[in-house]
Each structure stands twice: as structure tokens, then as C-alpha cells.
Design a protein with these regions (language model features):
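N-terminal small/glycine-rich loop or linker at the start of catalytic domains
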Residues: 2-20, 76-91, 136-149, 194
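Hydrophobic faces of well-ordered beta-strands that scaffold small-molecule active sites
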Residues: 6-9, 42-46, 78-85, 115-116, ...
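Active-site-adjacent beta->alpha loops and helix N-cap segments on the catalytic face
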Residues: 59-63, 121-137, 152-155, 180-194, ...
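Conserved small/polar residues in nucleotide/adenosyl-binding loops
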Residues: 549-554
Length: 557
């Protein structure tokens, strides 16, 4: 019998890889007991990545959600883990050091055991401080290697980085195969190399199923010493998400590994409940193409979760490109033609930009450059004329060192614009900021929260936190949800009037007792806006305001 392999359910990433939003706290506390009852998970990914920000976007408190979701697993002896972007922490741009340090204190207090720390550039200067901060806070820092496939991303390249991260105190290494394009043979060899050099270090493999290599990769890393495998479950496994725990268990058991049994009754209950969450509201924000695998992803190397946004980008420029071609008497392009052009351009620009691993946010930067290049080429203009500031920051070294060399034409372009390349510690560009946020909370009369968690949330996601506190976020989300629901019904053949009738079917009309002017809300920033059809009101909740016109008061009104 071979070694024991444990499983981690990446419940958070299942959702992030499928769509825009995460389940609400009331849904999470319902699914947690079923995940525990399945009996096959040593770990569960509960938060991090976009989880906290998404809660704010629909007007909920992420701190309550994290505490409520982690508690059942803690009680059951199951470890919880979160995703952490190193210098960028829980957002898409750099975070001051004092805010990063506070994050680990807060998340440990909220019940999170492990933080998976990654940097899209595999820049150790962005990861090592987080290892130190996590250890100080009592968390387990799992240092991460972002896996991709290129001439510079060799076994020795990754093993050398792993050596540095382990020396800095990381007791665990994650192989984060975010696009699923890591070649199985290379991943097996890398796992073996790390284990030979550091036999006591735990290795956890995280791979996406989009291009179709993930099962072979899982088998290779397990044969070479991996300890834990990230898995998903139906109805959200496969596609561009992750392999299903049932398939992984069957494959590994057949090869002689010790793997846990799965309580299939609990699995089916959890499967049905997750589908219930999709049907409730989350499905409206899920891109159906994320349920499809695609070998095309091997060519461009982009994460499968980006396909939805990439197709939306292409659809947005498709008609404009064809208008340009039509004006030149050239044949128009189908959306598939355009997709192949974009993939080819990604393949062209990626090495010239220094082979940044194609993971958030650098995958977006490379994709955006490629898309802009395609548009410029169609117009008969030159490449590289539309590079945004964030991409320039990456090129110039402000996010850390690129794995490969920049092309001479990129270096010359930077010099022609008067830009300077830097090689300083990226954190040095972002001074401490907690005192400013404390001042803002004091001025607003806001509580810092248990373990300073509210202070942390403002400092990490300031704009979204302010919108959450003001109520703007919840209203915006409700409006967005109604729009996507209406759009879904229209796709199914309902007219706008039919949708209104359906929403009003069980409603009783409210008759105003007097004539006057209706004000739906008192707004100091904009016009009075009617509530969306279907909004529910509680007893004694204000429905609207009326300015009454009477003969005695007419002059005043």
C-alpha cells in the first residue's frame, strides 16, 4: 500500500472559477455540516481571494461570513485555508505592510488555519514577508509556486524558489497550476525534487481542469510525493474548475494510495444544496462557458476562469473590428476567428513581456495588451501603442522581477517614454496606512470591530467597505440582480410587460388616500428612484413618501 493522500475541498475557488459571486453566510452555514458529513476532506478552502470583497459587493459583512463558515470545520477538526496574493493580499493591487500584517492577525482570530501565499511573478520578496507575518499571527504559511509552461519555467527554476521560501520558514509548498497547463511530467519531477531536498515539507497540488491535463498531473505529483490534492464536487467540478473528488479518489485508490472513503449520501445532499444556491441567485452570474473544457487553453496559457471575460471583451470589439475590415474591403471575421487571433497574439506578446506567470493580475495584463495589439493591427497600426499603467508597472519592475528577459523593443519603448526601470523591494513603494484608516473610522464613529476586523476590512477594500456601510452596495446588488433576472427571462421569450405581470401576480395594489407627488426615496445625491419590481418590504418599512396637495397648503408646496 502506498502513502496516504488527503483531499482539500476548494469550495471558495469552485465559485470564483465559475462566476462573479460567492454564497451568502446563511448558505455557507447550511452547506458546512454536509461537507463535514462527507468525511473525506482534511481541509476546506473557506475564504480569501475575492471572497471578502464579494461579500462587500452584495452588501454583507465578510467578517461575519468568515467566522460563521470556519467555525463548524474547526469544531470537526478540519483545517481551513484561504488564498492570499502576497503583496496584493486580498485585492488586485499592492497593500501597505501594516495592513498585510494585520490581515493575518484578523484571519487567524476568525478561525482560518492556513494561508496560501502566492505572487503572480513568483517574486520571493513579495512572499517572504507574508510568511513572517503569518507565523507571527499563529497561522500556517503555505508558500506557493505559480505553475506555467515556458522555456524559463523549469524544474530547477521552481525548485530554487521553493528552497528560498522553505528557508524563510514555510512548512508547506503549494503547486498552484492555475491554468492547468503545467505538464504532468514536469510537475512530477518538481514534486520529487522538492521532497528529496525537503522531505518534511508538505506539498499540496492545486490544478484546474480546463485544458484536460489535471488528472494526469494529479497522478504524477502523487507518485512523486505530494501529500494533499485540491478537489471540487458536483455540480461545479470539471469544466474550467477542478477535478471531482470522486474521480480523483477512484484513480488514486486504483493505484494503491490510501485515500479516504466518501459518504455518498452526504455528497448527494451537498450536491443538491449547491445546485439550490446556483438556482437561488448565483447562477445568474455564472458564465456557462466555464462548464466547458478547452484544449485551446494550452496554446495561450491563460487561466480557464478568464474565458468568460475574454469572450465578453471579444464580443465588445467584434462589430467594430468588422466595420474596419468592411471599410477596407477585407473579409469580416467570425468570433472564432477573432479568438484564434487573440490566442496567437497572447503567444506572441507573452515572451516579449518577460514570461509573467498567467495568474491574477498578470494574466489580465497580458490579455489586455494582446487584445489592444489585435485591434491596432486590424486598423493597420503598430503594436504596443495602447499599454495601460498597471501593465507598465509590471514591465518596469514595480511589482517585482519578471521571470524572463524583456524584448529589446519593449525596453526601447519604455525609454522613449521616459520611464525608468526599478529593482527595489516592491513593498517600499507603499507606505503604512492604518493610522489614516483609524482616523476615518473615528471620524465616522465606526467601531474597529472584534480583533480590529472592521478596521482591516476598510483598509483592505476601502471603497467597497464605504459602500457597504452606507447601504449603497446592497441596493446596487439588488438592482443588478433584478436586471440579470429580467435578462434571463427575456432570453426565454418573455416580454418586458409579461415579466412585470409575473412579478406582480401575487401583489396587492397600494392605493394612496390622497393626491400628491410620490417620492420613492429621499436622496441627497440623485433623483428619487422607484424600487425594482419584486422588491420585498417588511411590515412597518417605509414604502414611499408623499407630498400632499391641499387647498390650505398649496401655496407652501
Amino acid at each position: 500500500m502506498k502513502k496516504e493522500i488527503k483531499f482539500s475541498l476548494v469550495y471558495r475557488d469552485m465559485w470564483q472559477s465559475s462566476g462573479k459571486y460567492q454564497p451568502r453566510v446563511d448558505q455557507l452555514v447550511r452547506i458546512a455540516p454536509l461537507i463535514i458529513e462527507m468525511g473525506c476532506f482534511a481541509r476546506v478552502e473557506t475564504n480569501g481571494g475575492a471572497f471578502e470583497q464579494v461579500n462587500l459587493l452584495y452588501g454583507e459583512n465578510p467578517n461575519k461570513a468568515v467566522r460563521a463558515f470556519t467555525q463548524p470545520f474547526k469544531d470537526a477538526g478540519i483545517q481551513t485555508h484561504m488564498l492570499d496574493r502576497g503583496l496584493n493580499a486580498l485585492r488586485m493591487y499592492p497593500v501597505p505592510a501594516d495592513v498585510r500584517r494585520l490581515m493575518y492577525k484578523v484571519k487567524h482570530a476568525q478561525g482560518v488555519d492556513i494561508t496560501r501565499i502566492f505572487c503572480g511573478l513568483n517574486e520571493t520578496r513579495n512572499i517572504i514577508p507574508s510568511i513572517r507575518y503569518a507565523l507571527e499571527a499563529g497561522m500556517i504559511p503555505q508558500a506557493t509556486l505559480c505553475i506555467t509552461h515556458s522555456p524559463v519555467h523549469t524544474v530547477e527554476y521552481y525548485a530554487r524558489i521553493a528552497d528560498q521560501l522553505i528557508e524563510a520558514g514555510a512548512p508547506e509548498i503549494c503547486l498552484k497550476d492555475m491554468a492547468g497547463i503545467g505538464r504532468p511530467g514536469m510537475l512530477g519531477e518538481l514534486t520529487k525534487t522538492i521532497k528529496e531536498r525537503h522531505p518534511d515539507v508538505l506539498i499540496q497540488y492545486h490544478g484546474h481542469s480546463g485544458p484536460g491535463l489535471s488528472m494526469a498531473s494529479i497522478l504524477e505529483v502523487c507518485e512523486n510525493g505530494a501529500d494533499i490534492i485540491d478537489v471540487a464536487m458536483e455540480p461545479m467540478s470539471w469544466g474550467k474548475v477542478h477535478p471531482d473528488v470522486i474521480s480523483v479518489q477512484a484513480m488514486l485508490r486504483d493505484k494503491g494510495f490510501q485515500v479516504p472513503d466518501i459518504n455518498m449520501k452526504a455528497y448527494m445532499k451537498a450536491r443538491a444544496m449547491t445546485q439550490e444556491f446556483i438556482d437561488d441567485f448565483l447562477g445568474y452570474f455564472m458564465d456557462p462557458t466555464n462548464k466547458h473544457m478547452s484544449s485551446l487553453l494550452l496554446k495561450c496559457g491563460l487561466p480557464g476562469g478568464m474565458m468568460g471575460s475574454m469572450m465578453a471583451d471579444l464580443k465588445g470589439v467584434h462589430s467594430g473590428i468588422n466595420m474596419i475590415l468592411k471599410g477596407k474591403n477585407q473579409p469580416e471575421l467570425s468570433i472564432d476567428d477573432l479568438l484564434v487571433m487573440l490566442f496567437d497574439e497572447v503567444e506572441y506578446v507573452w515572451p516579449k513581456l518577460g514570461y509573467p506567470p498567467l495568474v491574477t493580475p498578470f494574466s489580465q495584463y497580458v490579455k489586455n495588451v494582446a487584445l489592444m495589439n489585435v485591434m491596432q493591427l486590424v486598423k493597420g497600426e503598430e503594436r504596443w501603442t495602447m499599454i495601460d499603467n498597471h501593465t507598465w508597472d509590471m514591465i518596469l519592475g514595480k511589482s517585482g522581477r519578471l521571470p524572463g528577459e524583456l524584448a529589446p523593443e519593449i525596453i526601447e519603448l519604455a525609454k522613449s517614454k521616459g520611464y525608468e526601470f526599478v529593482d527595489t523591494d516592491p513593498q517600499s513603494n507603499y507606505p503604512d496606512a492604518l493610522d489614516d484608516y483609524r482616523k476615518e473610522m473615528d471620524e465616522n464613529g465606526w467601531e474597529y470591530g472584534e480583533d480590529d476586523e472592521e478596521l482591516f476590512e476598510l483598509a483592505m477594500h476601502d471603497r467597497q467597505y464605504r459602500d457597504y456601510k452606507s447601504g449603497v452596495a446592497k441596493k446596487r446588488f439588488q438592482d443588478e440582480l433584478e436586471r440579470v433576472k429580467d435578462a434571463s427571462m427575456m432570453k426565454n421569450g418573455y416580454s418586458e410587460e409579461e415579466i412585470k405581470k409575473l412579478k406582480r401576480a401575487k401583489a396587492d395594489p397600494i392605493i394612496a388616500p390622497s393626491k400628491g407627488q410620490v417620492l420613492w426615496e429621499v436622496s441627497v445625491e440623485g433623483p428619487s428612484a422607484a424600487p425594482f419590481i419584486g422588491r420585498k418590504y417588511q411590515h412597518d418599512e417605509v414604502f414611499c413618501y408623499c407630498l400632499l396637495y391641499t387647498s390650505d397648503a398649496a401655496d407652501d408646496l
